[in-house]
């Protein structure tokens, strides 16, 4: 199914796409916040029954464009797994801010926009969590190896 939702893969899946062996349990994406894109996003994810991750069962949550427009970042559980929908990220900003710092990667047979290696390191450093610092060391090693093989 092609949805034409505008988003950028960041986080652990982006690190994996760049060669990190570290496993992740969720998909983090920065989505573009235009009304049209939010409507496409809601339509595309509706069949996956998105619900707020960690919320008590039965807590009212309406998966609709108004909910997404009123919020910014959503940690969701879907029928396919965990998904973090991010309107912006620390150290990187919005989808439009990040767009110049993307590369196209193949993920499960699909071409996806993914944060480039330099910017992935930058935003992980800005996030400042212990798990990000561990990932930064791996990503910097990957970057050094690429630079050696390019020269």
Q: What are the roles of these predicted feature ranges?
A:
Residues 1-151:
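Compositionally biased terminal segments of proteins
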